[in-house]
Amino acid sequence: MEKREMLYEGKGKKLFATDDEHIVIAEFKDDLTAFNAEKKGKESGKGELNCQISSVLFELLARHNIATHYIKRLNMSDMLCKKVTIIPIEVVVRNIATGSLTKRLGISDGSILSQTLVEFYYKDDALGDPLINDEHCKILGIIKEQSQLEILKSQARQINEILKAFFDEKGLRLVDFKLEFGQDSAGNIILADEISPDSCRLWDKQTNQKLDKDRFRENLGSVKVAYEEVLRRILV
């Protein structure tokens, strides 16, 4: 598969065209961003770790019949993916209260939620990725049919159950995570983007040590060392 011109560059990845119009290559970057890119950094090797972790988790989901854009990992930093049209919604799934949820609702940090919470955020950096509901999605023209929103919610909950059980076996708590979905050439809604410590909050079950991008957000030390530990555990 030939890697051709760059189609898009985001905060954590670059997308490249290939000799197949329906397939792209995602190249994972070493860049670190937080607070809507107000805080920026870089750590060598971070992109390769995210690529490897995402590949393991996409393959896990495939074994549970979850449709994703993932085809295969090409090398340490490149992933072959189906080309999709991204739905501009960040689907956030929360199992434990932390971050913005505690500030917004006054819930104690680290509290286990009585039920899984699924939230939608409008993907727009200029607006600060605001929290939105089903009606907002329709008014904005992001989603036209309620059935499509129900697919996003249902898929998010299924993915949560699979990942939560998997990470639990590896001694990790899946606190919360962000998903992005897209539509393939046939119009099917499938999981896209990545699943990594950049997009998931992962805490050690015994110590509650943070092994995710909060290490960068909160100046807790090396991101790479934490991501290496996550990769080590999920490969066991």
Curated annotation (Swiss-Prot):
* Pfam families in UniProt: SAICAR_synt
Q: What is its EC number?
A: 6.3.2.6
Indicate yes or no for the key word ATP-binding. Answer: yes
What processes in GO biological process is this protein linked to? 'de novo' IMP biosynthetic process; cobalamin biosynthetic process
- Keywords of this protein's UniProt record, alphabetized? ATP-binding, Ligase, Nucleotide-binding, Purine biosynthesis
> Known catalysed reaction(s)?
5-amino-1-(5-phospho-D-ribosyl)imidazole-4-carboxylate + L-aspartate + ATP = (2S)-2-[5-amino-1-(5-phospho-beta-D-ribosyl)imidazole-4-carboxamido]succinate + ADP + phosphate + 2 H(+)
Pathway named in the protein's UniProt entry: Purine metabolism; IMP biosynthesis via de novo pathway; 5-amino-1-(5-phospho-D-ribosyl)imidazole-4-carboxamide from 5-amino-1-(5-phospho-D-ribosyl)imidazole-4-carboxylate: step 1/2
Q: Name one GO molecular function term.
A: phosphoribosylaminoimidazolesuccinocarboxamide synthase activity
Family statement drawn from the similarity comment of this UniProt entry: Belongs to the SAICAR synthetase family.
Checking PANTHER family in the record gives: MULTIFUNCTIONAL PROTEIN ADE2, SI:DKEY-6E2.2
Name under which the protein is recorded: Phosphoribosylaminoimidazole-succinocarboxamide synthase
Q: Which gene encodes it?
A: purC
